[in-house]
Design a protein with these regions (language model features):
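Glycine-rich phosphate/adenosyl-contacting loop at the front of the ribokinase-like
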Residues: 1-61, 68-70
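Structural motif
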Residues: 4, 135-136
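Conserved N-terminal subdomain of the carbohydrate kinase-like
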Residues: 27-29, 36, 51-135
Length: 139
């Protein structure tokens, strides 16, 4: 049996807005569609690796909020080890506002890392026992 892969990364809730054109500073435009979904480079890597058949241990911090609940349900549904995903009260889970111009495909993104920004080196010490069991560590 192969050993798991440990991934240190961020989860953000992606809020994607599609529009015919991007607004100018101070302007409001009507959008065509909106989608809420999971995001974050590390989280996306963890999900892709899991779907490819790897056992995954994901390391991050999320808020104890609705977006954090979405993350935990996603990881449970995907079969990702969440032992070292810490839920932090009073700090929100990260979010990204993604505006996509449907004509050109170009986008503009604002990312707020939220609780993941509270990760510190000591957190890796706390996860050391899990990391030691893994064949790879990605950050």
């Amino acid at each position: 049996m192969s050993r798991p892969i440990s991934i240190l990364g961020i989860f953000v809730a992606d809020l994607t807005f599609r529009t015919d054109r991007m607004p100018h500073q101070g302007e409001t435009v009507i959008g065509n569609s909106f989608k809420l979904g999971p995001g974050g480079k590390g989280s996306n890597q963890a999900i892709a690796a899991r779907r490819a058949g790897a056992e995954i241990m994901f390391i991050t911090k999320i808020g104890k909020d609705t977006f954090g609940d979405i993350a935990m349900k996603l990881y449970a549904d995907e079969g990702i080890n969440s032992e070292f995903i810490w839920e932090i009260p009073k700090i929100s889970t990260g979010a990204a506002a993604i505006m996509v111009n449907e004509q050109s495909g170009e986008n503009s993104i604002i990312v707020v890392p939220g609780a993941a920004d509270a990760l510190v080196p000591d957190d890796l010490d706390d996860a050391e026992s899990g990391i030691a069991e893994c064949s790879f560590f990605m950050a």
